Amino acid sequence: MSKETLQHTMRSKVRVFEDGGIRLLRKGQKGLIHAIFSRFGLVLVLLVLQFGALFSLMRWFSDLLPHYLGGTLLVTAVMMVYLLNQDMNNSVRIPWLVVTALAPVLGVLLFCYTKEDVGHRMLKKRLLELEGQTRSQLPQNKKTGKALDADCPGAASLAQYLRGRGGGFPVYENTQVTYFPSGEAKFAALLPQLESATQYIFLEYFIIDEGLMWGRILEILARKAAQGVDVRVMYDGTCEFSTLPRDYPRRLEALGIRCKVFAPVTPFVSTHYNYRDHRKILVVDGRVGFTGGVNLADEYINHIEKYGRWKDAAVMLEGEGVRTMTALFLQMWSIQREPEFAQFLTRPIPETQANGFVIPYGDCPLDGERVGEMVYIDLLNRARRSVHIITPYLILDGELETALRFAAERGVDVHLILPGKPDKWFAYALAKTHYLPLLSSGVKISEWTPGFTHAKVMIMDGQEAVVGTINLDYRSLYHHFENAVWMRGVDCLPRIEADFQDTLAQCRTVEPTRQSVWQGKKLLHLVGIMLKFIAPLI
């Protein structure tokens, strides 16, 4: 079939809805039967067959059990010595020691799978190469660096880290930041920006799901692509498990939209499953960029309800700072392609007059730097009056928990808002295991009773804030590709603080008692206790 015939066939399957959006999938195509007979079903069957074959081999060679036991003792000893000499957080080291002691072979295999980047060395090498190329295209304006140092030496030190070991991210002035306290607000602002595109539109999202939100966006993207705008869409491979079929990239390409799937699902055990692209970036012509917690699915704009009301947050950047967001997208897009940094990063950006400083930044799980966590800890350590946080999850390592508690013990008003209606029961149980230690140090915790808080927001002393995709959990801090925006002195900071206070007004205050924390849910309490010692492995 020729390319022209394919495009005609795919376009004939596009359905236009009264809401002005378009759909590429038929209603019901994402149901159980479709899942069973899709790539998801194939992957599941092949994985079960692989593990079944391994189990059968163990039974057939049961007469070698004494030799196996001797070997496992040796493996356990070697692995424990190795773990004790690794540069890792003790809250991560101890669970690995326990798992290795209880199940040596499984522990070693699991460690190699999650920690040693087996199968990811080429990806790691490629990303480091791309990061090096990006640095030269994102020079630091020395005048801006000096201005930040004069304004706040502590913030300048953070900027130095993000520019150096943190990944080569410069600090910018002249960048207007608009804060959106909901997915609906972001969606309303996003559509006219897409309509204004004349050169390119880049989208990188963790989740895309057909419906009102994506349909409206897709209609504009298809129209812009037909007008000659360079439209590119990238989404994480886990969408193939839950929301989109395997051939969805072909469907988009038939509309003139270039598409890439990060780490597609394969029917073999692979470390690709461990590292996911959790970023949410949208860039229009290099002059406007969006990020935050909002994915492209209807629950994020409360068009459909899953866990009560959905509370999210996002920011829109206009001006020089968008250049880094463009670079972050191009890094991921260029993993298997020739990079195009110079083509897009050297274009002039319309001049914008704005107060304050911003640093858009990314976090790569393969470079050995926990950038997202380091930024959070830095804000906690420099806080003098308050640190207000909205987060969907709370699965902490020792360093971040210590930073939260120490800030509160210094007299800082540390206040966290978490969901009253969680999306994952095991994550909810694990979060609650942290409540009492934090509360005992003076940290305040509230739960948003209308529904689920998916926003990732931290505001410090009303002067600095971080809004992005980075959750307070192990997967975000250790295993995901993430991004966020640090900001200081920008005009939207009072709006961020006001949103925190508005959200707090709808919360239940958690008191420092077991009854207040667990609310009599004994099974949830038991699950939290059982899961906590392996939390870093989840």
Language-model segment annotations:
Residues 393-415, 419, 424:
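Helical hairpin unit composed of two closely spaced alpha helices linked by a short loop
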Residues 373, 401, 431-435:
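A general structural signal for well-ordered alpha-helical packing
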Residues 2-374, 378, 382, 422, ...:
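N-terminal localization/anchoring segments of enzymes in phospholipid and broader phosphate metabolism
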Residues 206, 393, 427:
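Glycine- and other small-residue-rich loops at beta-strand/loop junctions that grip anionic moieties
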Residues 412, 420-473, 477-478:
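C-terminal structural cap/anchor segments
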